[in-house]
Swiss-Prot record:
GO terms for cellular component: cell surface; extracellular region; plasma membrane. The gene is IL1RAP. This is Interleukin-1 receptor accessory protein. The keyword Membrane applies. The chain crosses the membrane at residues 368-388. It comes from the Eukaryota.
Length: 570
């Protein structure tokens, strides 16, 4: 029986096709009306002819003797075939201009055609139907409708979409709402109210996909309708302002020379306004850029904030600007539902600055050369410069300081060190430079207590000059007593300075006072024959460490011992 019905249907369908093939108004495939439905859910689809293409409705067409015929083309096939309305439980049926699926299956995907005709008139249109699967989180490739809520605007609602006509008003369905995968219950500001979902106050955190699942009975069966929509929280109209032009502005001047590229950005902020048309455009001398005989390019970019506030940037570009172009008026305009604003860019020709390239180069080179010379001179002659300053501008340290000696000399008591101290150091410091030295073995009185006299001499001296040698660091010597006393005096009272002169190299020592002194004090090294000349570096370093004295130096070569002329034989 079923086979016979198919054969008869195909026969009559072929006749209809052949009769109407030449005179049927075919509106083609309406891709703008792509219908997507979930598998195993009901679907009702109205013939698009009465919604978009014809000026009369189904009742008028039926009264005029027109018949509505349905057929379809399976997915990935070209052959059109009639729809089987004799499936078990009337899974596919037609009611007036509506095609019903109770429920849909995956293999229902295809292009469906509704044709309205009689013996003299024919009109048809096709539309695609896609049956898709859904997962546990209601994810699918469906294109979701977007519902916009105003941020912090008060109570707002969304309604479960596309459920009208599936069940009579006498049926009370069960509606469950989800946000993503989570059932909405006990949310702080979102309350399900049947077909509606109320937002007491909308925040950015409410952005997301919301799904309503409508469950209703029909003829002893239970059907489910799943509808998902995207909620986007946008700026409130209470906070909307007219367009704001950030650039051009009064703080930026576009200075160019003829032949350079001129780039002027027009950046405009638009508050979100529902259904507002935001526009940005340039005028040059009050005209559109297309009406000006210059090569102008305008590029636009658009960005949005989280609340759909919009920033538009139009960059006006002239590749090679002329002097005439730099005299023109460039004005950026912006318009929205809140109003219209305009701002002119400040454009002018750059005045070339005077070029003093050679003069600047010579001046800079001379300055650098002078600095280098001064650095070299200071590095080489810094001792002489310090001594010159001390001699002419230094303050005499010996006035009213209560000291008797300039220098107390501490050294190891053996023949070599004694010869160095008594002949070399004393000869130059006293005879050439005029300093008064205290040498214990020379200036102490017989019969005194060594410790007391040593401390007394150190107290009366302005400097403690320590002659370092391997013999100096031997434990229990008078030299170490002098070193300790001088360092303690320098640390506690600060009225004596310690000078370290290395007569001979000293290996690693266990004397902690000497270790500490060598860490914090500069060591002046005696280099034998190289250091004997009184105007040499050794004696200049020593002079810098000595106290400043204004008294004239002794020039007599035979006063109190040997002069420098006798040092050559030492």
């Amino acid at each position: 029986m079923t086979l016979l019905w198919c054969v008869v249907s195909l026969y009559f369908y072929g006749i209809l096709q052949s009769d109407a093939s030449e005179r049927c108004d075919d509106w083609g495939l309406d891709t703008m009306r792509q219908i997507q439905v979930f598998e195993d859910e009901p679907a009702r689809i109205k013939c698009p002819l009465f919604e978009h293409f014809l000026k009369f409705n189904y009742s008028t067409a039926h009264s005029a003797g027109l018949t509505l015929i349905w057929y379809w083309t399976r997915q990935d096939r070209d052959l059109e075939e009639p729809i089987n309305f004799r499936l078990p439980e009337n899974r596919i049926s037609k009611e007036k201009d509506v095609l019903w699926f109770r429920p849909t299956l995956l293999n229902d995907t295809g292009n469906y055609t509704c044709m309205l005709r009689n013996t003299t008139y024919c009109s048809k249109v096709a539309f695609p139907l896609e049956v898709v699967q859904k997962d546990s989180c209601f994810n699918s490739p469906m294109k979701l409708p977007v519902h916009k809520l105003y941020i912090e605007y008060g109570i707002q609602r969304i309604t479960c979409p596309n459920v009208d006509g599936y069940f009579p008003s006498s049926v009370k369905p069960t509606i469950t709402w989800y946000m993503g995968c989570y059932k909405i219950q006990n949310f702080n500001n979102v309350i399900p109210e049947g077909m509606n979902l109320s937002f007491l106050i909308a925040f950015i955190s409410n952005n997301g996909n919301y799904t309503c699942v409508v469950t209703y009975p029909e003829n002893g069966r239970t059907f489910h309708l799943t509808r998902t929509l995207t909620v986007k929280v946008v700026g409130s109209p209470k906070n909307a302002v007219p367009p704001v032009i950030h650039s051009p502005n009064d703080h930026v001047v576009y200075e160019k020379e003829p032949g350079e590229e001129l780039l002027i950005p027009c950046t405009v902020y638009f508050s979100f306004l529902m259904d507002s048309r935001n526009e940005v455009w340039w005028t040059i001398d009050g005209k559109k850029p297309d009406d000006i005989p210059i090569d102008v390019t305008i590029n636009e970019s658009i960005s949005h904030s989280r609340t759909e506030d919009e920033t538009r940037t139009q960059i006006l570009s002239i590749k090679k600007v002329t002097s005439e172009d730099l005299k023109r008026s460039y004005v950026c305009h912006a318009r929205s539902a809140k109003g219209e604003v305009a701002k002119a860019a400040t454009v002018k020709q750059k005045v070339p600055a005077p070029r003093y390239t050679v003069e600047l180069a010579c001046g800079f080179g001379a300055t650098v050369l002078l600095v280098v010379i001064l650095i070299v001179v200071y590095h080489v002659y810094w001792l002489e410069m310090v001594l010159f300053y001390r001699a002419h501008f230094g303050t005499d340290e010996t006035i009213l300081d209560g000291k008797e000696y300039d220098i107390y000399v501490s050294y190891a008591r053996n023949a070599e060190e004694e010869e160095f101290v008594l002949l070399t150091l004393r000869g130059v410091l006293e005879n050439e430079f005029g300093y008064k030295l205290c040498i214990f073995d020379r200036d102490s009185l017989p019969g005194g207590i060594v410790t007391d006299e040593t401390l007394s001499f150190i107290q009366k001296s302005r400097r403690l000059l320590v002659v370092l040698s391997p013999n100096y660091v031997l434990q229990g010597t008078q030299a170490l007593l002098e070193l300790k006393a001088g360092l303690e005096n320098m640390a506690s009272q600060g009225n004596i300075n310690v000078i370290l002169v290395q007569y001979k190299a000293v290996k690693e020592t266990k004397v902690k006072e000497l270790k500490r002194a060598k860490t914090v004090l500069t060591v002046i090294k005696w280099k034998g024959e190289k250091s004997k000349y009184p105007q040499g570096r050794f004696w200049k370093q020593l002079q810098v460490a000595m106290p400043v004295k204004k008294s004239p130096r002794r020039s007599s070569s035979d006063e109190q011992g040997l002069s420098y002329s006798s040092l050559k034989n030492v």
